Amino acid sequence: MSNDYIEHYGTKRHSGRYPYGSGEDPYQHEGWSWLARDKKLKEQGFTEKERATMLGCENTSDYRNVKSRYVNEVKAGQIARAKYLVNEKKNTPAKAAEIMGIPLSTLKSYLEPDRENRVNLTQHTAELIKEQVDKDKYVDVGRGTNINLGVTPERLKKAISQLENEGYKVQYVQINQMGTNHKTSIKVLTKDDVDYNTLKDNKYKISTLGGNKIVDENGEIVSTKTEPLKSISSKRIAIRYAEDGGTEKDGIIELRRGVDDISLGKAKYAQVRIAVDGTHYLKGMALYSDNLPDGVDIMFNTNKHKDTPKMDVLKKLKDDPDNPFGATIKGEEDLKMTQRYYTDKNGKRQLSCINVVNEEGDWNSWSKNLASQFLSKQSPVLAKKQLDLDYAEKRAQLDEINSLTNPTIKKKLLESFANDCDSAAVHLKAAALPGQKTHVILPFSSLKDNEIYAPNYQDGTEVVLVRYPHGGVFEIPRLTVNNRKKEPKSVIGNATDAVGINSKVAEQLSGADFDGDTAVVIPLSAGVKIRTSDRLPGLVNFDPKEAYPYREGMKVMTPRYKQIQMGVVSNLITDMTLKGATDKELERAVRHSMVVIDAEKHKLDYTQSKKDNNIDELRRIYQDGGGASTIISRAKSEIKVPARKEFYGISSINTDPKTGKRIITETGEEYVKTKKNKDGTEEKENVKVTQKITAMESVDDAYKLVSSGNYKIEQVYAEYANEMKSLANEARKSYLKTGNLKYSPSARKTYSEEVDSLNKKLKKALSNAPLERQAQLLANQIVDAKLAANPDMDDEHIKKIKGSALITARARVGASKQRIELTDKEWEAIQAGAISENILSSIIDNSDLDSIKKRATPRGADTNLSNAKIALIKSMSSRYTIAEIAERAGVSSSTVTKYLNA
């Protein structure tokens, strides 16, 4: 039999010479046939479950969807036939009813004007969804999306089932849930040719039904996209090139004071993007200047030379109306000091030309930890002190969680704590040093090479600066605070999170520029000693932008590849330092790292840099030709393992109750790999499906990742990682031993009003689920961008930016997530067991966790501290202030004083 065939394109209702359903034999259609078989099986006594299996359905739910679809299809056919017989064949209704063999009343109902629309609602819903999937490729069809279409959840389910039968498919993708350590699972409808990896790579392109639009209170569909950019004319901009001193302020945007459309509001500085002529944009740190030439409102400083045309100095806007700058900008609702809108001289509200990425105050809480790429290059004694302090803090946290009285809340926090400790073992970040803060760096030529303007520190204080990625002690400037300098004082005054340095100091910070680069400032004292050294000779006056400029035909580095290569070269430098590389060898690696840092931003020729600095040779010598070779670099490096089953949460299925260790279960999945031989023949073999995990995740004992050199600093980090693994296991064991909340029917009756109130609050919190998922997607995108800009951000700040990003995202997509606020009486009802554990779990997910935790903590716990917390306070007493200890321990300053004097 031939496999050739002619495929018919069209739809059942719209193709063919005669209307769908107008044929003489109603059983010619598959719907009639299927329903007839179902009816016959039912008459023979088969149950619904048995009929589902016999008719090829996956389960009873699938059976009901198929049946509903065919019932609608048959009914639509009957309506079409009734209209055809009456309107086209000119039969009387009575005659048409006779021909069709149905009662006259039924036929008349078929002729009602909106009857066809009502019957075809599933079909119309399916067509609307199909249209959006064809346009957007990835569409969220999860809980609540039916509201956007004005249909019931059941109708939506049936429409999706119909589309699945037409070749579309439902897939699930998970994203991080902002504010918790949980995942949000998004149900996505795609075409059949979209595999899971493609969906995962494009998760930020998932749209919600309605096409990223929401329905307002009047039923009108309104866009949730950001307002179009307002551009400034290039005629108002001047360029200060390298020959005129632009290099010393590279990345600084000087603004004329008092000009409304470029005002910074109450802020003295901000990291901004400014659209120019609708085609280009400026990016950098904006400051006010009182020394601009007449007719110039903006002066942009660059290290480019005078032969570069003005518009080539600027960057081209990206062809993406939702993200033209390639960076997340703040909306008006997020700004505290920097202007977004202004009122013009006619009293009208106008959009500012200033688009803010970070404003004054945003950098204040960054990097309250010490990354291993810095601390591992310091003394093992200092590293151990800071890692021990981090362990002491986590030990105290676990004791506090174990003291909680509500089992559901306790388990939530134990699970989150275990995940945090597993992550800490991988990332190896230590506690911050006293007075340590991240600041954005700004240039002031009046400062000497050994001076810093730092209003957060006292005059005369000696400090060091650390910038990431960190190459070595030769990249750490040692400076003295001078807050008396007029120039920085007049420009940034008492800046909350900015410091002033000159361009020579910036060069030592691995070639930092001033478009928003940051540095960690660490004050030195008798208890804090940081190793530093002079710059390596081969790095003096090295400018990666001058040494490796763009050349025609070269491969341009992508943002993703930049992150990979930064990790590769950072690991190489770490391993070289531990293994005693020479200064000349370190110069080569660090020069290449400086090129990699700026390669994507300035389109640098990183492949030529790799050749010139012979990076492959360094990897052969210090990494055995492979990748990471010490625990510092190996911990986060990825390895492939057989694919594992994903279990979410903690249970006896995925956790050993005796040890608390995770139980690894392989999926056993395989695929056929075809190998072509030289003679043209093919060989096929079954190969296990793999997945990537970090090396630290793959071992129970961190010492297995220590190099053959067994360096002292490696031992310090291995010990810390094992302590984190032990705490995680302890938390999981405690979770499994913690019982469930006992539900009490009598308590439900006693607290019936409170139960009703809690259910209403929860229903309201869950009512905008689709928009909340869109907000979670957008928030993840914002956080990813922030983490890419500051990969060594500490957990505390990551938590803060997640919260901030979610607020921004909710406002942007129109989601109105409402936190549930509990009354004392409602809490009493919860403690009495008036609601189920599942309901309480949902309430916790939609409440302020700190507030819930406070209610669940035994009275007096804030003053009668655990032994672990007392030990934490005393371990910090010799180097930290009372205020710093109180902040880290989560207690008042008076409580700290009480225990230190005990």
Regions found by a protein language model. Name each.
Residues Q44-F46, N91, G580:
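Charged, low-complexity interaction regions
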Residues D517-V521:
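A short beta-strand element within the Helicase C-terminal
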Residues R17-L35, K610-K611:
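Short linear, low-complexity motifs centered on an aromatic residue
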Residues S2-G23:
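Short acidic, low-complexity intrinsically disordered linear motifs used
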Residues K49-L55, P93-M100, G144-N146, E884-E887:
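Short alpha-helical "recognition helix" segments of helix-turn-helix
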Residues R37, N72-Y84, E88, E116-V491, ...:
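Beta-strand-enriched accessory nucleic-acid recognition/scaffold domains that flank the catalytic cores
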Residues Y63-R64, K108-S109, K157, T897-K898:
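Key DNA-contacting residues within the recognition helix of helix-turn-helix
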Residues E58-D62, P103-T106, T152-L156, S892:
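Short coil turns linking two alpha-helices in DNA-binding domains
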